[in-house]
Design a protein with these regions (language model features):
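Acidic, Ser/Thr/Gly/Pro-rich low-complexity segments that form flexible
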Residues: 289-293
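Membrane-helix interface motif
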Residues: 231-237, 272-288
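Cytosolic-side membrane-insertion boundary helix
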Residues: 195-224, 228, 234-258
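Soluble extramembrane regions of membrane proteins in the secretory/endomembrane system
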Residues: 1-204
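Conserved small/polar residues in nucleotide/adenosyl-binding loops
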Residues: 294-299
Length: 299
């Protein structure tokens, strides 16, 4: 889903700026119970073990967590040794499990959160907003609430304050489709880890992505009609489906030969396209979402 690509984009953009990046996806289900004693430290310790084995990592670390991978992210933040090396933590439509006593607010990290649709932002940390450390700004976007503008960056990254950015649009399938979320997320990255690199605007990237996506969608819709056409007229299918075809005398020999040739050509021309639509969509997302070019378009 597109929220996964947004994690890759974050990782590539941070890596482009010289950071060591850990991309946490799904924790191993069944490896350990989740939230035992109100913590997630035991969910995926293998991430921490691997991180500690990399002795050359002494700082400039970014950790991301996608969906349930947010549990892995939490395990990173709760590790007393490694959390001090983390400069930025990114949770994308993530699950949590931290408690006030286990959040390492004293460490050098900042957080950008895109909360899941319909989930109380406070539930990620399991305690009331009033009980949150003053360094953490908990934000909830409520329909009809215009107390702040969509896309506004809250908190001060220079002081390493943590930020929770909650939007009703940040759902799993569509987290990284909308242009305003593109811009906002890269705004977070830019302020979390500033770079001296000059980024040239390229406004054609996003419209091109949409155009190609709509073309693929149209081709996918056409698949049903073409399949029905094949069942109705292709000789190989019509006999098994008991479809009545025009007799040879009803149409000319040339027209019949052309129709049979067309019936045979259609599957060879179109079906490989349909069969690879999913992989093509992945390729499109990789090209238009998982490169720094999309960042140059919206930073």
């Amino acid at each position: 889903n597109n929220s996964a690509y947004s994690e890759f984009v974050y990782g590539l953009e941070f890596a482009r700026r010289g950071y060591v990046v850990f991309l946490c996806d799904q924790p191993k289900s069944g490896e350990a119970p989740i939230n035992v004693n109100d913590t997630s430290r035991n969910v995926f310790d293998s991430w921490i073990d691997y991180a500690h084995s990399q002795k050359y990592i002494d700082g400039r670390v970014v950790v991301t967590g996608l969906s349930k991978g947010g549990m892995d992210l939490n395990a990173f933040l709760m590790d007393p040794e490694f959390s001090a090396k983390i400069d930025c933590a990114v949770n994308i439509v993530g699950a949590g499990g931290l408690r006030e006593s286990t959040v390492p607010f004293g460490t050098n990290f900042c957080a950008v959160w895109a909360a899941a649709d319909g989930v109380d932002a406070n539930s990620f940390f399991g305690y009331d907003e009033n009980g949150v450390d003053t360094r953490l700004y908990m934000v909830r976007e409520i329909l009809g609430d215009d107390s702040y503008q969509f896309g506004t960056l809250l908190g001060d990254f220079e002081d390493r304050t943590a930020v929770q950015f909650n939007t009703v649009f940040a759902v799993h399938p569509f987290c990284y489709i909308f242009k305003d979320i593109h811009s906002t997320m890269y705004n977070f990255v830019g302020q979390a880890v500033p770079t001296d690199t000059t980024l040239a605007p390229d406004d054609l990237v996003y419209p091109t992505f949409l155009l190609v996506s709509w073309i693929c969608c149209f081709l996918f819709i056409c698949m049903g009609a073409l399949f029905a056409y094949m069942l109705a007229v292709a000789p190989g299918f019509s006999s098994s489906m008991a479809v009545v075809l025009p007799s040879a005398s009803a149409i000319g020999a040339k027209k019949r030969a052309f129709r049979i040739a067309l019936d045979l050509i259609v599957p060879f021309v179109f079906y490989p396209i349909f069969a690879t639509l999913i992989s093509n969509a992945t390729w499109l997302n990789t090209v238009f979402c998982c490169t720094s070019k999309i960042g140059r378009a919206h930073v």
